[in-house]
């Protein structure tokens, strides 16, 4: 009987330890458009690969950017273990790109959610903030782990690609919202910030010590490239324009830029070839190396402390 109780206690301890670990991510999935499709990088070609990638890495919660309604529907169909929260940026419903938060339904209870616009009037739908070229939004959730009962907030955004002031003031707005909304509860902010780690807006996110960059805070990191690839797997950059910021109560154990790719046949059928150093039983054909999006997803493993 003592052995049974001991095994049960050990099992509970392992379950609790696993529940304290949280894998989060950010993924600009690139909007669905015909220009990409004509080059072989269309959404229909890549979305199943993209969803398989998310599932393989086991994101517990992640933010996505540039998501149109049809893309959101495709992702939820391919990944039924996730629920999502978010609205279209143009009308606060389904028009325009979403910046949704996805979370695992079985693990988390949704306590609160919403969207605000990155502008001087965050509650006003569809507005452009400061010098932004487009309306920009931040969607958020407040979740509770069903096992540990720990509560935390998750914000996801896409900053403007043109407006310098909009990015700087937008970063100030995000910090203000985190302070006002979250209190002492942990908070995570993910997104395509459209600026790298050397930019003023990036450093604005770190001012006051409210948040830290998971890349810098990680005990271990695997990041052999930056986060933007322009649909070209041969390109390399030091710039990280996609970020995961966390409040100080969250421990960051690991961080990674996920550079997985896939291959499609060439337009003309390629002949079989043999590799000089390969076993002769192996044949190769020329294929095109592609990326699931024009951004690489990023991931961080966090520890949620009670």
Task: Indicate residue ranges for each PLM-predicted region.
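Bacterial Sec-dependent N-terminal signal peptides
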Residues: 1-21
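N-terminal, active-site-proximal structural segment of metallo-dependent hydrolase catalytic domains
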Residues: 16-78, 90-97, 172, 290, ...
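Short, Asp-centered acidic motifs that coordinate Mg2+ and/or phosphate
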Residues: 22, 60-61, 152, 186-188, ...
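Active-site metal-binding loops of divalent metal-dependent hydrolases
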Residues: 27-29, 157-159, 192-193, 296
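Short, solvent-exposed loop/turn elements at domain surfaces
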Residues: 31-40, 111, 164, 222-225
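Structured beta-strand-rich core segments of catalytic domains in phosphoester-bond hydrolases
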Residues: 61-155, 159, 254-259
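Active-site neighborhood of phospho(di)ester-bond hydrolases with catalytic His/Asp-centered motifs
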Residues: 62-65, 86-87, 188-192, 213-216
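Metal-dependent phosphoester-hydrolase catalytic domains
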Residues: 165, 176-187, 195-306
